[in-house]
């Protein structure tokens, strides 16, 4: 058995996974940027490893996280959306003496979708996780592209607006600054004067107010910015398909049909003959946990 851990920008998921990469048991909880969040995360990970280990032979612990994974030192640095400069997992390894494999969260989720989900029938594809930020994974000829330091292909940080809005990475005008679902939801809540609300309830409120001039403008701007970002991705990689994951999936009724229609209508790419298939992630929150142990 293996333990797959997905540390996202707003949640942590921990699963017990069998030899066929099927989840047997899982637990999920919300987290947020705050003081000492590193210690809280390590405590949660420690608790569930100990729990699963009591009745299972654990051969691997896979951890998918935003930031820069360093498997040599067992550290993850620059988890910017949680304000974590360095998350040190070496003590976990020394305590349990179980191999630990660190991966980028979006690349882990993309790998799971590529092998078992929405992208399994394609050889050339791009996975975009639109949530707290925009994470990405790129597949060419059936292989996940990896940069020299396992950090590259950060498509969320392609600049789509010169001197645009400030991004957490330090640059301005990044793709994720305009198209991360967190930003969209924040703007929608401000327009509708709503504070505490779930994503599902917020989507219903937006649907009810779809004729609201500001909401309609917000949706149009979001789709327009998404197409600009996608045009860069398509021109660079020429994928057969692009899969959207993250909370974008829960808002598909607002965006999906209109996005596909506008993509085919505008053909805002160098090669105007072929438009990649736009698909939605199938594994949802399970993808990161599964991909962490592949």
Residue ranges and their predicted role:
Residues 10-11, 108, 132-135:
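Conserved A3 ("GATE") glycine/threonine-rich loop of ANL adenylate-forming enzymes
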Residues 1-60, 70-73, 90-100, 115-122, ...:
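ATP-binding/phosphotransfer module of carbohydrate and carboxylate kinases, centering on a glycine-rich
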Residues 74-85:
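A charged helix-plus-loop insertion that forms the helical arch/lid used to bind
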Residues 25-28, 79, 147:
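Residue-level detector of high-confidence beta-strand sites
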Residues 120-178:
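Glycine-rich phosphate-binding loop of actin/hexokinase-like ATP-binding domains
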Residues 103-117:
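Conserved PLP phosphate-binding loop immediately N-terminal to the Schiff-base lysine helix
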Residues 105, 131, 292:
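Active-site glycine-centered loops adjacent to acidic/histidine catalytic or metal-binding residues
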């Amino acid at each position: 058995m293996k333990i797959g851990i997905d540390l996202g920008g707003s949640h942590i998921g921990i699963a017990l996974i069998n030899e066929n990469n099927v989840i047997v048991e899982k637990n999920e909880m919300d987290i947020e940027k705050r003081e000492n969040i590193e210690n809280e995360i390590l405590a949660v990970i420690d608790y569930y490893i100990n729990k699963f280990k009591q009745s299972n032979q654990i051969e691997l612990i896979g951890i998918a996280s935003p930031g820069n994974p360093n498997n040599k030192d067992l550290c993850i640095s620059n988890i910017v959306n949680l304000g974590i400069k360095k998350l040190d997992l070496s003590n976990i390894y020394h305590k349990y003496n179980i191999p630990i494999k660190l991966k980028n969260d979006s690349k882990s989720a993309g790998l799971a979708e590529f092998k078992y989900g929405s992208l399994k029938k394609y050889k050339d594809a791009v996975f975009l996780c639109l949530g707290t930020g925009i994470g990405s994974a790129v597949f060419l000829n059936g292989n996940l592209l990896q940069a020299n330091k396992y950090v590259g292909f950060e498509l969320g940080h392609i600049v789509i607006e010169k001197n645009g809005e400030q991004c957490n990475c330090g640059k301005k005008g990044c793709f994720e600054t305009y198209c991360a679902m967190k930003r969209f939801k924040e703007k929608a809540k401000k327009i509708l004067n709503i504070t505490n609300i779930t994503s599902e309830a917020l989507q219903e409120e937006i649907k009810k107010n779809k004729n609201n001039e500001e909401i309609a403008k917000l949706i149009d701007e979001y789709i327009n910015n998404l197409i600009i970002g996608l045009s860069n991705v398509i021109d660079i990689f020429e994928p057969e398909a692009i899969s959207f994951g993250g909370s974008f999936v829960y808002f598909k009724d607002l965006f999906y049909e209109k996005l596909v229609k506008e993509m085919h209508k505008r053909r805002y790419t160098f090669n105007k003959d072929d438009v990649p298939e736009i698909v939605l992630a199938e594994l949802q929150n399970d993808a990161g946990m599964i991909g962490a142990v592949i």
